[in-house]
Amino acid sequence: MTGGATGALPRTMKEGWIVYARSTTIQAQSECIDTGIAHVRDVVMPALQGMDGCIGVSLLVDRQSGRCIATSAWETAEAMHASREQVTPIRDRCAEMFGGTPAVEEWEIAAMHRDHRSAEGACVRATWVKVPADQVDQGIEYYKSSVLPQIEGLDGFCSASLLVDRTSGRAVSSATFDSFDAMERNRDQSNALKATSLREAGGEELDECEFELALAHLRVPELV
């Protein structure tokens, strides 16, 4: 999900509800990106939304590097795992349309917060980090109590999410903003926040990338 994206208003969270996500990263050919976006919108998204337990799909695109990330959200781990066989040919065809090969990861959606719906022109800053596997819970609580309120104060803030892989200690923090201009204006402030947060949480930055939010239709509840 990646990405902190929203295409619908939040639902009420069930007590103790844990939501999951599967992300597919494709290194696309630049001339195939628009065709790939249309394929996700017209073919992949309707197919996934018809599967039991799927509660949303988003697509992030970085035209400069060619990196594209499609993320599907699922009500339960069981629903996500049960969909694997159905999803595989859909994913492989999607990768062909983008002119690349898919790399798949599965996550727990540890946090999701929206200020308002995303609109055309919205962009996402995604930061991949790693913490010791035995400190994932502490990292999640630190994100919710300290990092998220500060992200929410950034210019143009729309929504934010945190995806975690408890086994590896890896996580993806994504923040959606109203426009690229807003994201550009808050970049220095975001970098300062990131440096402080990683130091205090004992985390390591693995990667960061800024994307256009090409598609978003998510019904993931507020998880804060």
From Swiss-Prot:
Assigned protein family: To M.tuberculosis Rv2558.
Coiled coil: none
One Pfam family cited in the UniProt record for this chain: ABM
Gene3D superfamilies membership: 3.30.70.100
InterPro entries: ABM_dom, Dimeric_a/b-barrel
Xref: SUPFAM superfamilies: Dimeric alpha+beta barrel
GO biological process: cellular response to starvation
Record's protein name: Uncharacterized protein Rv2557
Highest taxon of source: Bacteria
